[in-house]
């Protein structure tokens, strides 16, 4: 007898349909799974056999063949345990064939419990696109999968519960999507940072336009402290961003039933010893790396020159495209990587170059060699470069209360609202994403601005990419000021962020 159970597969953040075909025939007892299964899929034979017997049902003593179609696509993971088990029960007449619009996925324990799998949200979204109406998933994945709008998600705790449901004895209650918390709470605040008003202004501009930023200053100046507070002024994630980022985290199994969706913008801060694979992703399973885990959030690289040159150069393409494609002999996977790059570094190897105390002992050649660890093409992709000076004692003792993150965030959200209206109907999300058509339309300079830009271009030796990035930053500064056009003062501030000695070297 032949049965067919609908299931799903997941490769990266892309889901696809998989049909699990089970055939029971006369012959010597055997249990074969075909259709390019990996080791975990092949091991399903023992898990399924034990689960069926443990729950008081008969396992066929005959020839049993399971095909995972399409047979030319490699199948990986334990998510096919549940559809294989149901296919066997249907083929032996234990239960009726489920409707073709229902899909099943989940790992099965020897006792028949249904355990969570990775990539549940991606497969739920794929089920929605395919046109499936019902999705049966492990209870631990149900809250995550329920964010697919037009699919009814049923949480399954064990196979006995599912069998009773399919027989019509006791129905499983569908899972509803949990309520999203719109205002994230942070344990840190900009109000905790004394002085550094110029740096805070640069971070506000970066947050308002989604610009990449580099902080340069001596040890103890507060570079890391300021960078870690950047997420507190970023606008809240919308539903589409939450789902996109959650898909990446789900691939690694980083979601939980209590926290099924990524609600706050990620802040990833890998150590400077991070490997190329850990940063960009890869491995035998083609898993996402730090750049993808920072999607719709912040990727913070402290001690930038200490990172491997290969790691830094890998970032150039994702910074431009907002995605990264990992290719191996087994295939290729594309992950989103729309992140804000925030970097911090000392001005020289010892960290005290240019400090009023005169503590630096680095020669000009040493300073240039240290700066050269950050390549020109990577610097070209950083919109804002600003110095973080050491604080004076009177600044530390000041009783003036700095602006809170909530106040700064209001200005940032106002500027982002202007950008959403401006880019309605386009692929741009913020000013940092503007391409040539948008730059021509929204970043036109008047005669005074054009002359100022020409002087800066010639005196600073700017590239065409730097020219475009200055105009993007100027557009953001104008948005923060509520100006429809880019004025000379907006352009001057944007140019100021490209005049650091690091660029000149």
State the predicted function of each range.
Residues 296, 302-303, 314:
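Walker B catalytic acidic pair
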Residues 59-62, 98-99, 129-131, 149, ...:
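Short loop/turn elements that form and flank the Walker-type P-loop nucleotide-binding site
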Residues 239-275, 282-283, 389, 429-437, ...:
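Conserved inter-motif catalytic segment of the P-loop NTP-binding fold
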Residues 1-214, 218-224, 327, 467, ...:
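Peripheral, non-AAA+ core regions of ATP-driven protein-machinery
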Residues 204, 261-266, 276-299, 331-332:
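Conserved alpha-helical scaffold flanking the Walker A/P-loop in AAA+ ATPase domains
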Residues 111, 301-308, 351:
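Catalytic P-loop NTPase motifs of RecA-like helicase/translocase cores
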Residues 215-256:
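Walker A/P-loop
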Residues 34, 40-45, 60, 67-77, ...:
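Basic, amphipathic alpha-helical bundle interface domains used for macromolecular binding and assembly
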């Amino acid at each position: 007898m032949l049965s067919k159970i609908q299931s799903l597969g997941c490769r990266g953040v892309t889901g696809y349909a998989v049909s699990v075909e089970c055939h029971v025939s006369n012959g010597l007892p055997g249990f074969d799974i075909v259709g390019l299964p990996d080791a975990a899929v092949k091991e399903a034979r023992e898990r399924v056999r034990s689960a069926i017997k443990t729950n008081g049902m008969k396992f066929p003593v005959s020839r049993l063949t399971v095909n995972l179609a399409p047979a030319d696509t490699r199948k990986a993971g334990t998510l096919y345990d549940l559809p294989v088990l149901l296919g066997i029960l249907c083929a032996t007449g234990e239960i009726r064939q489920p409707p073709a619009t229902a899909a099943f996925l989940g790992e099965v324990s020897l006792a028949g419990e249904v355990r969570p799998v990775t990539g549940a949200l991606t497969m739920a979204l794929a089920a929605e696109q395919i046109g499936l109406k019902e999705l049966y998933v492990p209870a631990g994945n149900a809250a995550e999968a329920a964010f697919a709008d037009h699919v009814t998600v049923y949480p399954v705790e064990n196979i006995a519960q599912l069998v009773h449901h399919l027989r019509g004895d006791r129905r499983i209650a569908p899972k509803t999507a949990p309520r999203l918390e719109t205002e994230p709470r942070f344990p840190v605040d900009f109000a905790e940072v004394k002085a550094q008003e110029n740096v805070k202004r640069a971070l506000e501009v970066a947050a308002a336009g989604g610009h990449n930023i580099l902080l340069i200053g001596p040890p103890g100046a507060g570079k890391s402290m300021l960078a870690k507070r950047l997420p507190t002024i970023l606008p809240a994630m919308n539903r589409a961003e939450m789902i996109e980022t959650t898909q990446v985290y789900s691939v690694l199994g980083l979601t939980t039933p209590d926290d099924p969706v990524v609600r706050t913008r990620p802040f990833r801060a890998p150590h400077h010893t991070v490997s190329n694979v850990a940063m960009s992703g890869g491995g035998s399973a083609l898993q996402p790396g730090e750049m993808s885990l920072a999607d719709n959030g912040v990727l913070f690289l402290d001690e930038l020159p200490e990172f491997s040159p290969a790691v830094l150069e890998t970032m150039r393409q994702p910074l431009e495209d907002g995605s990264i494609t990992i290719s191996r002999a087994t295939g290729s996977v594309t992950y989103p990587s729309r992140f804000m790059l925030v970097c911090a570094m000392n001005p020289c190897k010892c960290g005290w170059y240019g400090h009023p105390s005169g503590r630096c002992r680095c020669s000009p050649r040493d300073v240039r060699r240290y700066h050269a660890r950050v390549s020109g093409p990577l610097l070209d992709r950083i919109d804002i470069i600003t110095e973080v000076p050491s604080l004076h004692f009177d600044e530390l003792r000041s009783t003036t209360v700095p602006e809170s993150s909530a106040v700064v965030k209001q200005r940032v959200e106002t500027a982002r609202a202007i950008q959403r209206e401006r880019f309605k109907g386009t692929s741009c999300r913020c000013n940092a994403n503007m391409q040539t058509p948008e730059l021509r339309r929204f970043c036109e300079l008047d005669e005074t601005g054009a002359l100022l830009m020409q002087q800066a271009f010639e005196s600073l030796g700017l590239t065409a990419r730097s020219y475009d990035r200055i105009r993007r930053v100027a557009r953001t500064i104008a948005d923060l000021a509520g100006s429809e056009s880019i004025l000379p003062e907006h352009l001057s501030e944007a140019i100021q962020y490209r005049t650091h000695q690091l660029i000149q070297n």
